[in-house]
Amino acid sequence: MNINVAELLNGNYILLLFVVLALGLCLGKLRLGSIQLGNSIGVLVVSLLLGQQHFSINTDALNLGFMLFIFCVGVEAGPNFFSIFFRDGKNYLMLALVMVGSALVIALGLGKLFGWDIGLTAGMLAGSMTSTPVLVGAGDTLRHSGMESRQLSLALDNLSLGYALTYLIGLVSLIVGARYLPKLQHQDLQTSAQQIARERGLDTDANRKVYLPVIRAYRVGPELVAWTDGKNLRELGIYRQTGCYIERIRRNGILANPDGDAVLQMGDEIALVGYPDAHARLDPSFRNGKEVFDRDLLDMRIVTEEVVVKNHNAVGKCLAQLKLTDHGCFLNRVIRSQIEMPIDDNVVLNKGDVLQVSGDARRVKTIADRIGFISIHSQVTDLLAFCAFFVIGLMIGMITFQFSTFSFGMGNAAGLLFAGIMLGFMRANHPTFGYIPQGALSMVKEFGLMVFMAGVGLSAGSGINNGLGAIGGQMLIAGLIVSLVPVVICFLFGAYVLRMNRALLFGAMMGARTCAPAMEIISDTARSNIPALGYAGTYAIANVLLTLAGTIIVMVCPGLG
């Protein structure tokens, strides 16, 4: 039996789509030195090559892909989006505006200089900034721009062509810039990280190991009684001195949970909870030969929960003000916008931050109720909320504003982005509403993006040879300029106008570019995870601004060139 592969693929859109995705994802795993191509560019390259062979796909698949992607971007940004606007994140907001705004202006100027149409210009902006949200926003606005069919088709083809030609330029140039730009300014990143660590009492270790607390039981001997000197547990402040706290006491065969007025006596058996290194640091005379095994005394359920910050008595407060250890709980991690933050007593908590807390189940539940709520450990997505807000986003995108003879609408991209932000924000405030496991959200977002990239590549592939020969050199120059010049402008603005600490500034710059590989280089250079504070500060708002930039560039200059 003979199988005509070309006819088989052209006759089955679903098969073609998944062949492109499979081949593209394989290609995306290839590395050029230390740089991995990535899924987006892999799928785009494969789809462009197959597009040259006149394979095509139903445009409905492309539309659904970009809608899912942009909606999920909004959901991820939602918990921290408003806190960046309305509280102490004005520096991060201004940095993101400078980065995106300068890139937008430079791209428009270069597009005018080289005589490109709006499709090439917007695609070059998206690729140089390694930002798929720009591509998505521009593509959606073009489709709703009222262009005649042939002109629209050319603009969309050029959009994906510009993106494909400049994506690697933008990625490589930013990674190289992240490696060498810190060396061109007079403040060493490692010194800057240590400086802010001293000022704020931060943990600078980028590779800090996380241990769970353990429970051990000891019999109180004369050495420990002498050390307490008749003081009660409250006066001793035993956790501050040892890193452990007393969970239970057995005295005369009676098991009890001690209060602050309890005084240790000879022969008491105590259950100490603390990290392994805290147990190891205990005075040997307190523990050597005195450890006991008592099933009831040691019968404590240590749990680790992810606590979402929500309540007003925690939002805006420093970690130190929560006094977790006074409540018998241990902090393992602080997560903001999927970025792990330094464990720092002076880190100010935002609504939607996630604290990984360990301790006795009852104590963790108590502290969680005071801070916010325990994140649901479920693999079940609230599809009702997901679909309802998706519909709301589409309806918002249909709104059109009319001014005399000029009209414009938000479009699906802006509508879905706004609806996603609202869903993410409400999820951060209501633990049982709109729950989407992070794995499920990431999968839908990635799948939507890959479908979108496959669609634009197949649509644009037929014209890539002509375009590459005519504008390849110009695209190389423009891509480098748009990738690096806004970074330099952002650095000058942050360093000399905002006067930011350099470690935080470089982290914030990488967040404004939403580039995780470059962020890793900055952290390695600083030998610290301090830059993650800046990265998390700009990342959420930058994703939103980049989507709007794709819309704005088309609305401002629809006939560029």
Swiss-Prot record:
Alphabetized UniProt keyword annotations: Cell membrane, Membrane, Repeat, Transmembrane, Transmembrane helix, Transport
GO cellular component, one term: plasma membrane
Main location, first listed in the record: membrane
Superkingdom per UniProt: Bacteria
SUPFAM superfamilies the record matches: TrkA C-terminal domain-like (SSF116726)
Transmembrane segments: 8-28, 32-52, 66-86, 94-114, 158-178, 383-403, 406-426, 451-471, 475-495, 503-523, 540-560
PROSITE patterns, per database record: RCK_C (PS51202)
A Pfam family of this chain: TrkA_C
Compartment annotation: Cell membrane
Membrane topology, record value: Multi-pass membrane protein
PANTHER family: K(+)_H(+) ANTIPORTER SUBUNIT KHTT, TRANSPORT PROTEIN YBJL-RELATED
Xref: HAMAP family: YbjL
Protein name as it appears in the record: Putative transport protein YbjL
Biological source species: Shigella dysenteriae serotype 1 (strain Sd197)
This protein's encoding gene: ybjL
